[in-house]
């Protein structure tokens, strides 16, 4: 599909990057950005953004901005996929370096008390006393559990703005409640931590 025919979803989320071709029939290898790549499996429409500097051979025709996925499976640390729009290895190699986006609406429904990181980023964080600790800027994966990186802009004695960062483990011992509707996380965490 050509660029002018494709309408990107407003809720497009970057979920991986095409790293290489797979086989001779146009398969592509995608490095997912999550250890649980279900978003790639649940969507049959992958939106592509080309790299700033092409990594593969120059394409004979414009790169597609939408792939209609016919099959996707895990292969070690990558996802191997085939698409209607990629006919052979040369076409697959031309996609090397493209970022892969899917609609957030196509993500599988999370289980109770499970959240996609993308849904937590930007939420306000308050403690049990109602004191604002900042907003979730990012999450870190420590292997054992996720950690919220909460940032808050504060003013020092000279009136300069300083960004304060708190790292709060995303575990039941510290997380009292998560409300996606109210866009707020309540934590057992003091201002002085």
Curated annotation (Swiss-Prot):
Superkingdom, natural source: Bacteria
Main location: cytoplasm
Keyword rRNA processing attributed: yes
Subcellular location: Cytoplasm
The entry's keywords: Chaperone, Cytoplasm, Ribosome biogenesis, rRNA processing
Pfam families: PRC_RimM, RimM
Any single GO CC term annotated in Swiss-Prot or TrEMBL for this entry: cytoplasm
Record's comment describing the protein's domains: The PRC barrel domain binds ribosomal protein uS19.
SUBUNIT field: Binds ribosomal protein uS19.
Protein known as: Ribosome maturation factor RimM
Organism field: Methylibium petroleiphilum (strain ATCC BAA-1232 / LMG 22953 / PM1)
Organism lineage string: Bacteria, Pseudomonadati, Pseudomonadota, Betaproteobacteria, Burkholderiales
This protein's encoding gene: rimM
């Amino acid at each position: 599909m050509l660029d002018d025919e494709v309408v990107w979803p407003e809720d497009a989320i970057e979920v991986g990057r095409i790293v290489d071709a797979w086989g001779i029939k146009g398969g592509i290898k995608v490095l997912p950005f999550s250890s649980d790549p279900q978003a790639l499996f649940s969507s049959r429409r992958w939106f592509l953004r080309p790299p700033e500097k092409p990594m593969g051979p120059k394409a004979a025709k414009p790169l597609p901005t939408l792939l209609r996925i016919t099959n996707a499976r895990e292969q070690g640390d990558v996802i191997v996929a085939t698409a209607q729009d990629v006919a052979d290895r040369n076409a697959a190699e031309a996609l090397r370096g493209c970022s892969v986006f899917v609609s957030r609406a196509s993500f599988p429904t999370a289980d109770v008390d499970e959240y996609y990181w993308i849904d937590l980023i930007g939420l306000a964080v308050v403690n049990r006393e109602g004191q604002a600790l900042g907003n979730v800027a990012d999450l870190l994966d420590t292997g054992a559990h996720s950690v919220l990186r909460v940032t808050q802009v504060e003013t020092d004695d000279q009136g300069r703005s300083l960004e304060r960062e708190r790292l709060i483990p995303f575990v039941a011992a510290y997380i009292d409640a998560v409300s996606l509707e109210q866009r707020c996380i309540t934590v057992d965490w003091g201002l002085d931590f």
